[in-house]
Every structure is written in C-alpha cells, then in structure tokens.
C-alpha cells in the first residue's frame, strides 16, 4: 500500500508554517500543507488543539466552499480574542454567500441583518459584546484613500488592501462596489436637484411676467415654494453614506 511521507514537524513548527502561509495569502499552498500532515492519532490530537492550525483549516474550508467543515471547526473549538475578527468575518461571509446562492440574488443590508439574526456568532469566536457591523474609522480611512486612487481595484490590490485592513478580499470588493453605487446615486441626486431648481426659477419668472408688479411677486411664491419642496425631496432620495453591512 502506498504510504504518505511522514513529516517530522513538531506542533509548534506546523503552527509556524500555517501562520506564514496564512499571512502570505497563499491558500492553495496552505491547503496542500494541511493535507500532508500526519494522521496518526497522537499527532492529530496535538494539532487539533493548536489554534493556528485550526484557524488555517477554517480559512481553507472557507476558500474551498466547504462551509459545513468551516462551521464545525468554529463551533467546536474555543479561539482566543486575537482570532475573533477574522473568524467572525469568515462565519458571516459564508452564511451570506449561502443565502445569496439560495435566493439567486445579492443580499441587501436588511437581508444581511436577517442572516445574522438567524445565524448568530458562536461563543467560541465571540466574547459576547455587540458588534456594530460597521468598519472602524482607520479601516474606512484606508478604504477611502485607495478608492480615490482607483475606484476599480484589481484582485491583487484587493488582497493587499484586505491584509492592510484585516478584512477579507470579498469585503473589500463589496465596499468598493457599494461606494461606487453611492457616488452614482449622489451624482444623480445633484442633477435632479439642479433640474428642479431650474424648473422652479423658470416658473416664477413666467408668473412674474404674466402677473406683473406685486401680484406677480405673490404669484411666484407658490412656484418657489414648490421648487424648494421638490429639491428637498430630491435630497432625501438616496440613503446616507453608510459603510455598514458590507
């Protein structure tokens, strides 16, 4: 029978390799390395207690679409707070992707809220504090800086920015997509506001010419008032510049 080569690595050495490959973002090599690890009961027991190895297995499970394995790892092993942020992102993103596949469409903020309510974070990767699902100010600042340089980052830049912010490449991509949508909506809102104001000015000038004198001034007031209300309505068409639920 063919025998797999036995790697004489200590659990600490295995953990070090996992951490290095995780930081490099080379998920394919990380997966191959995990597959090559020994399956002897004694070795498995030691590795199954190592957080770096467990985190690496969770990351590989996520990137290969093996969400059942991901959930099993996260629900059955207690992780330290240093790993919570990344593992929480994997948990939520996996459930989001499953929901999108089931519904056949991208999820909106309300959809994501419902998914989070249905699949709350397990206490193994959560300390019980409520999470706002908004990015920290430092993260938003970095994202905005990169957005001003390039609103359409390629996959390599997304991975680089993900490492700089502690987010996943998918989260980075979603933020850029949502930001582009908000900018387009804001531009459309401004155009509509200018059109409404221009129409209101035209109506009031026409009313003044037709009525003349004080009567004309009185007649123009409803038109000006109407244009102001329309402009106000136009301003509220788009939502606020929210950066939550990404």
Curated annotation (Swiss-Prot):
Keyword set, alphabetical order: Developmental protein, DNA-binding, Homeobox, Nucleus
Location relative to the cell: Nucleus
SUPFAM superfamilies xrefs: Homeodomain-like
Taxonomic lineage: Eukaryota, Metazoa, Chordata, Craniata, Vertebrata
GO CC, alphabetical: nucleus
Name of the protein: Homeobox protein SIX6
Polar residues: bias regions: 195-204
DNA-binding region: 126-186
Domain of life the protein comes from: Eukaryota
One Gene Ontology molecular-function label: RNA polymerase II cis-regulatory region sequence-specific DNA binding
Tissue expression profile of the protein: In the developing embryo, expressed in the anterior head-fold, the anterior neural plate and optic vesicle. At later stages expression is maintained in the eye, while brain expression becomes limited. Not expressed in the lens placode.
Ranges where the record places region Disordered: 195-246
Main location: nucleus
């Amino acid at each position: 029978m063919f025998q797999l080569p036995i790697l004489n690595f200590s659990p600490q050495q295995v953990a070090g390799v996992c951490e290095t490959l995780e930081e490099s973002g080379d998920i394919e090599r990380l997966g191959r390395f995990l597959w090559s690890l020994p399956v002897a009961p004694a070795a498995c027991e030691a590795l199954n207690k190592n957080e770096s190895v467990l985190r690496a297995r969770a990351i590989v499970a996520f990137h290969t679409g093996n969400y059942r394995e991901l959930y099993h790892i996260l629900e059955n092993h207690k992780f330290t707070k240093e790993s919570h942020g990344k593992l929480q992102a994997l948990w939520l993103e996996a459930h989001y992707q499953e929901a999108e596949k089931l519904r056949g469409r991208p999820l909106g903020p309300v959809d994501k809220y419902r998914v989070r309510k249905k699949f709350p974070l397990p206490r193994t990767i959560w300390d019980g504090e409520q999470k706002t699902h908004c990015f920290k100010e430092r993260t938003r600042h970095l994202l905005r800086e990169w957005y001003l340089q390039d609103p359409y980052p390629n996959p390599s830049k997304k991975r680089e920015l993900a490492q700089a912010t502690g987010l996943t490449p998918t989260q980075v991509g979603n933020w850029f997509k949502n930001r582009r949508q908000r900018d387009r909506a804001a531009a459309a809102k401004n155009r509509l506001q200018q059109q409404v104001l221009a129409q209101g000015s035209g109506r009031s000038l026409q009313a003044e010419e037709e009525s003349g004198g004080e009567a004309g001034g009185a007649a123009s007031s409803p038109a000006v008032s109407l244009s102001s209300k329309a402009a106000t309505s136009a301003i509220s068409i788009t939502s606020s510049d929210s950066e939550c639920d990404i």
